[in-house]
Regions:
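Juxtamembrane intracellular "pre-TM" segments in multi-pass secondary transporters
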Residues: 2-14, 278-311, 507
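Extracytoplasmic gate region of multi-pass secondary transporters
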Residues: 39-44, 305-359, 416, 450-451
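Central cavity-lining transmembrane alpha-helices of secondary-active solute carriers
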Residues: 122-139, 349-362
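Cytoplasmic membrane-interface "Motif A"-like loop-to-helix N-cap segments
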Residues: 142-154, 367-381
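C-terminal ends and interior cores of transmembrane alpha-helices
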Residues: 155-178, 381-395
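Cytoplasmic helix-loop-helix junction between adjacent transmembrane helices
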Residues: 183, 189-227
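Symmetry-related core transmembrane helices of the 12-TM Major Facilitator Superfamily/SLC fold
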Residues: 251-270, 471-489
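C-terminal transmembrane helical hairpin of 12-TM major facilitator-type secondary transporters
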Residues: 372-419
Length: 507
């Protein structure tokens, strides 16, 4: 039997089978991305002590503030959905007018500080960064394969999500390590979840490389990213309405934990397909077998590769300028651009919807035309422009924020669509799990530290409840400029080393 005849028997040569595998694992990651960002639109109730009251005109205020302007309210318990209150407001002309406000919903706030919220947001990567668990996860992936590692990581996600839900659903008194006990427990859950999510991320990426090498790999990775962004968009759009409907911050967290349980079941279904794929290539020298033959000495191939380190640092800087920004973007829309709280999460929500369409498009272009390094340069330049526009004190209106967010969506599609499919061109399949683990590990340093930095900068630039976002956005713009330099260097190194980043993926 010829080699060609053998190759035709591989399960991943069936277009239907490889795309089915992609859909299943992408669904699991979509559930994960929903949970990752489910707390983003809830910053206001998280950082408000006592009840927070939302009105039918899209505004909100704390119960204490409402009682100050409406002395007839004796206590928080008197505030109920449907009640109408009259408040006096002073117009720009100095005249006093009466405004009627009808309560549309209330949420019990947790009373965290901005610093607490920043620490919590950064907790996602604490275990991965400080205990090196993501790095070890990559070693486990290369030694044990995608089935064992995938089930392990998705189970960790669910356990961490359950702990996080328990923390925000229950009141805790006292402090631990100088922080409120509730914040510490929520951080623990989010850190365990983050460990599982990042290991799941590298596992799914290797799954795609396993099924799509020699096929539409950039398109497949682009579609996986697109579906993940659907999860992010759903979190930004629906987290606050779910919390308002239930009256508690814990409701969307519980919803997200339930979604993760479904994602775990989906991955177990994928494992059946993966076993069949391995069986279909059992008698050949394949990538499936090389996964089980990893040796620690193979790490030298990774550590001595210049192109690998440039992509790693590009990933660190690029994602540090996007994901932490999204965590604070809802309040940016409210405070700087005057968007009502009930709509503020929808503008950042445009970002995932844009990437849903554009990431697969740019991935398909990379598959057919190449120019991966060039795409990364263009995306990094656009990233810098976006954050400069957000930092500048001009056009503080909602439509300008929408335009800039759409531009960020293009940026967020260009770089990942070229960056992730480029790694298998630089690193052999046998070390691919460890390579992705190192990239994700270093990326997590940024995802852990940057939210804390930005949270503290925002706190330092907040007076009387109003925040000046010039400095935080300038920091993000600096990250973009660094990304431009790194991506240019990557193109230069690619030309010297011949990685083929500018060549098409389909031959």
């Amino acid at each position: 039997m010829t080699t060609t005849q053998k190759l035709q028997k591989r399960l991943n040569d069936s277009k239907a089978m490889r795309w089915t595998a992609l859909i299943i694992v992408s669904f699991t990651m979509m559930m994960a991305y929903f949970f990752t960002d489910v707390m983003g639109p809830l910053e206001a109730p998280l950082t408000t002590k006592g009840k927070i009251v939302y009105f039918d005109n899209g505004t909100y205020m704390s119960a204490d503030a409402l009682m100050n302007v409406c002395p007839s309210i004796a206590s928080e318990g008197d505030i109920a959905v449907g009640n109408t209150y009259c408040t006096e407001i002073i117009g720009e002309d100095g005249n006093t007018a009466t405004e009627s406000l009808t309560v549309s919903s209330t949420i019990n706030g947790l009373g965290w500080s901005n610093g607490d919220y920043g620490i919590f947001s950064g907790a996602y990567g604490y275990i991965n960064v400080f205990l090196l668990m993501l790095f070890f996860g990559g070693l486990i992936l290369d030694k044990m394969g995608v089935r064992f590692t995938g089930v392990m990581s998705t189970a960790l996600m669910f356990v961490g999500a359950a702990i996080k839900w328990y923390a925000v659903d229950n009141g805790f008194s006292g402090e631990m390590f100088g922080l409120p006990t509730q914040v510490v427990i929520a951080c623990l859950g989010f850190a365990i979840y983050g460990m599982g999510c990042e290991i799941a991320g590298i596992t799914v990426t290797k799954v795609i490389a396993k099924w799509f090498t020699g096929h539409e790999m950039a398109l497949a990775m682009g579609l996986q990213v697109a579906l993940a962004r659907v999860g992010t968009a759903c979190a930004l759009f629906f987290a606050l309405p779910i919390a308002q409907s239930a009256g508690t911050v814990s409701a969307p967290v519980m919803f997200g934990a339930s979604a993760l349980c479904i994602g775990l079941i989906s991955y177990i279904v994928y494992c059946v397909m993966d076993k069949k794929l391995d069986n279909s290539i059992a008698n050949q020298e394949t990538a499936g077998e090389s996964e089980e033959q990893f040796k620690f000495s193979d790490l030298k191939v990774i550590f001595c590769n210049k192109g690998f380190w440039l992509i790693t640092f590009l990933c660190l800087i690029f994602y540090a300028a996007v994901f932490p920004f999204l965590k604070f973007a809802t309040n940016l829309m409210i405070i700087k651009y005057g968007v009502t709280p009930d709509l503020a999460g929808m503008i950042p929500g445009l970002l995932p919807f844009g990437t849903m369409l554009l990431t697969p498009l740019f991935g398909s272009l990379y598959d057919k035309m190449g120019k991966g390094a060039t795409l990364m340069i263009i995306g990094s330049v656009l990233l810098t422009i976006v954050h400069v526009l957000f930092a500048m004190p001009l056009l503080n209106v909602w439509w300008f924020a929408v335009i800039v967010m759409i531009l960020l969506g293009i940026t967020f599609s260009l770089v990942p669509s070229a960056m992730w499919p480029s790694v298998p061109k630089i690193i052999p399949m046998k070390q691919l799990g460890s390579a992705y683990a190192i990239i994700f590990y270093i990326q997590n340093i940024g995802l852990s530290m940057v939210p804390v930095l930005i949270g503290n900068v925002i706190a330092a630039n907040t007076n009387d409840g109003t925040t000046d976002y010039t400095m935080p956005m300038s920091i993000f713009a600096l990250f973009g400029a660094i990304a431009v330099v790194i991506s240019v260097l990557l193109k230069i190194v690619d030309k010297k080393q011949g990685y083929g980043l500018e060549k098409s993926n389909i031959e």
